[in-house]
């Protein structure tokens, strides 16, 4: 099992990144490949999950061990495969997902791509009580790193010329619900301009 890979981002595309580690390029599928775009000059650590099944051998990577562990737990849920797990993690923050499972919030879980009522119920049945510190209280969440679509939206806002301090002021309002990158950008612009 490969715990993590530390190296330089060589290539970024919509589905995966390539990490150059000592001259070997590792193709790693991530929930949000473009979050690694800004790290092209510096060494990055990607925590990996090695997925081996009939005819499939793939690496899935995450910025934190916690997110990687949540991905592994999602794969244990009937009806969720690697692509579904990545889509769920790309659409929201791990702590919000864990809290929704602990609180049995089916409506929130159904907002994630590919998750209907049946899958949401299965997630609650299989994972409730098994996510530990991920379902942290609100005070701990405020300092949590951005992930998924929100990180992409923040990168887009920076590209549009907004200052980091302006963006930080609206992040708590953006974290209130899971949205796509486009929806986050629209909401952020409304908050910044309004």
Swiss-Prot record:
What Pfam families has UniProt attached to this entry? Answer: HHH_5, RuvA_C, RuvA_N
SUPFAM superfamilies, alphabetically? DNA helicase RuvA subunit, C-terminal domain, Nucleic acid-binding proteins, RuvA domain 2-like
Q: Where is this region: Domain II?
A: 64-142
Name the principal localization, coarsely classed.
cytoplasm
Q: Which segments carry the region annotation Flexible linker?
A: 143-147
Q: Where is the signal peptide?
A: none
According to its UniProt entry, what is the function of this protein?
Answer: The RuvA-RuvB-RuvC complex processes Holliday junction (HJ) DNA during genetic recombination and DNA repair, while the RuvA-RuvB complex plays an important role in the rescue of blocked DNA replication forks via replication fork reversal (RFR). RuvA specifically binds to HJ cruciform DNA, conferring on it an open structure. The RuvB hexamer acts as an ATP-dependent pump, pulling dsDNA into and through the RuvAB complex. HJ branch migration allows RuvC to scan DNA until it finds its consensus sequence, where it cleaves and resolves the cruciform DNA.
Q: What is this protein called?
A: Holliday junction branch migration complex subunit RuvA
> Gene for this protein?
ruvA
């Amino acid at each position: 099992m490969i715990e993590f890979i530390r190296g330089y981002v060589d290539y970024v595309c919509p589905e995966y990144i390539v990490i150059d580690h000592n001259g070997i390029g590792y193709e790693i599928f991530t929930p949000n490949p473009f979050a690694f775009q800004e790290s092209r000059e510096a060494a990055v650590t990607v925590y990996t999950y090695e997925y081996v099944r009939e005819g499939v051998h793939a690496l899935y990577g995450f910025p934190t061990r916690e997110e990687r562990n949540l991905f592994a737990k999602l794969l244990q849920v009937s009806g969720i495969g690697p692509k579904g797990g990545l889509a769920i993690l790309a659409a929201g923050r791990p702590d919000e997902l864990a809290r929704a499972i602990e609180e049995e919030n089916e409506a929130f879980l159904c907002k994630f791509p590919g998750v209907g009522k049946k899958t949401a119920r299965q997630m609650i049945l299989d994972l409730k009580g098994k996510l530990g510190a991920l379902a942290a209280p609100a005070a701990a969440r405020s300092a949590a790193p951005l992930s998924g679509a929100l990180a992409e939206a923040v990168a887009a806002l920076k590209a549009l010329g907004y200052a980091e301090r302006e963006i930080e002021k609206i992040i708590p309002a953006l974290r209130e619900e899971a949205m796509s990158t486009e929806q986050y950008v629209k909401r952020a612009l409304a908050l910044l301009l309004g």
